[in-house]
Amino acid sequence: MAEKENTKRNRREEILQALAQMLESSDGSQRITTAKLAANVGVSEAALYRHFPSKTRMFDSLIEFIEDSLISRINLILQDEKETLNRLRLILLLLLGFAERNPGLTRIMTGHALMFEQDRLQGRINQLYERIEVQLRQVLRERKLREGEAFELDESLLASQLLAFCEGMLSRFVRTEFKYRPTQEFELRWPLLVAQLH
């Protein structure tokens, strides 16, 4: 029984990896169909539906992976790092680095791969960005408690500016067909971002 569960889990992961790979190699102008996905995995469409009730559920699973990966690592950063600017820098690098290592998933994160899918999926991505923005805002607000110094500008404005920078870098990554890496020149850009915070 355990072996059957492992086989099923492995097949599910194989399907999700194939979908992510197809998103990476696709220009996003055409919908990825279950027929194309099944052919890519080497199974029938019926076999796909034994593992996922719909293509929407496949995208849900990929979004869950993105959420779990980012939020759990943000929590680790907040646990391990105490200095505000280091926390912000590491969170931004996490988001940009995750996208860089997962180009197919970046198409989901930018909404590019969701154009032909259910609106609910875009809503989930919007919620993910809202959660990240809340975390950034909290880090900014905690500066006064941790370091005895507050930012001059409103923390909500600063958090949205930092997130907008990341979203812009992810969009550029997708637009350039993954040639312009999100982390490219980050160390040169970071002082510019810090200057905006003061």
UniProtKB/Swiss-Prot annotation:
Residues 119-144 form a coiled coil. GO terms for cellular component: bacterial nucleoid; cytoplasm. The keyword Cell inner membrane does not apply. It is found in: Cytoplasm, Nucleoid. PROSITE patterns: HTH_TETR_1 (PS01081), HTH_TETR_2 (PS50977). Signal peptide: none annotated. InterPro entries: DNA-bd_HTH_TetR-type_CS, Homeodomain-like_sf, HTH-type_TetR-like_transc_reg, HTH_TetR, NO_SlmA, SlmA-like_C, Tet_transcr_reg_TetR-rel_C_sf. Residues 9-70 form the HTH tetR-type domain. SUPFAM superfamilies: Homeodomain-like, Tetracyclin repressor-like, C-terminal domain. Residues 33-52 bind DNA. The keyword DNA repair does not apply. Keywords: Cell cycle, Cell division, Coiled coil, Cytoplasm, DNA-binding. One of its GO terms (molecular function) is DNA-binding transcription factor activity. GO terms for biological process: cell division; negative regulation of division septum assembly. Belongs to the nucleoid occlusion factor SlmA family. Required for nucleoid occlusion (NO) phenomenon, which prevents Z-ring formation and cell division over the nucleoid. Acts as a DNA-associated cell division inhibitor that binds simultaneously chromosomal DNA and FtsZ, and disrupts the assembly of FtsZ polymers. SlmA-DNA-binding sequences (SBS) are dispersed on non-Ter regions of the chromosome, preventing FtsZ polymerization at these regions. Homodimer. Interacts with FtsZ. This is Nucleoid occlusion factor SlmA. It comes from Sodalis glossinidius (strain morsitans). The lineage of its organism: Bacteria, Pseudomonadati, Pseudomonadota, Gammaproteobacteria, Enterobacterales.
